């Protein structure tokens, strides 16, 4: 459950370390985002010589949440922290070329197959 002002870790090599959600996309009064939802973020902490810099406003897809994802069989997949993958604002494809840590199977649609293929583990 990601909402405005939530701080997230970044699970790719775009150069950002910490980001903050500034808007949940997909509806005029939508409050929460879960795994697979697109959010608008601003970079709060970045490494030198990265692809992004502090203060940039971009889109990102949520890949891990502490709240977790409930599967149809009743099981819940939870993680230790909230993480996202930064996307290009126009094409909505990942900026980074590597993904760190596991991602969930809920990302497996036409939009995010690139993230699934780059991820080291799909749960």
Curated annotation (Swiss-Prot):
Keywords: Ribonucleoprotein, Ribosomal protein, RNA-binding, rRNA-binding. Gene3D superfamilies: Ribosomal protein L14 (2.40.150.20). One of its GO terms (biological process) is translation. GO terms for molecular function: large ribosomal subunit rRNA binding; structural constituent of ribosome. PROSITE patterns: RIBOSOMAL_L14 (PS00049). One of its GO terms (cellular component) is cytosolic large ribosomal subunit. It comes from the Bacteria. It holds the Pfam family Ribosomal_L14. SUPFAM superfamilies: Ribosomal protein L14. Belongs to the universal ribosomal protein uL14 family. HAMAP family: Ribosomal_uL14. Binds to 23S rRNA. Forms part of two intersubunit bridges in the 70S ribosome. Part of the 50S ribosomal subunit. Forms a cluster with proteins L3 and L19. In the 70S ribosome, L14 and L19 interact and together make contacts with the 16S rRNA in bridges B5 and B8. This is Large ribosomal subunit protein uL14. The lineage of its organism: Bacteria, Pseudomonadati, Pseudomonadota, Gammaproteobacteria, Enterobacterales. The gene is rplN.
């Amino acid at each position: 459950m990601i909402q405005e002002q939530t701080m997230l870790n970044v699970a790719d090599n775009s150069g950002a370390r910490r980001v903050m959600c500034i808007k949940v996309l997909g509806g005029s009064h939508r409050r929460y985002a879960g795994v697979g939802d697109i959010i608008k973020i601003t970079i709060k902490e970045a490494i030198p010589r990265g692809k992004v810099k502090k203060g940039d406003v971009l889109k990102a897809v949520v890949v891990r949440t502490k709240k977790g994802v409930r599967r149809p069989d009743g099981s819940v997949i939870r993680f230790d922290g909230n993480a996202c993958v930064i996307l290009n604002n126009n094409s909505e494809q990942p900026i980074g070329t590597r993904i760190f840590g596991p991602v969930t199977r809920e990302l497996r649609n036409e939009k995010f197959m690139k993230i699934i293929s780059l991820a080291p583990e799909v749960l």
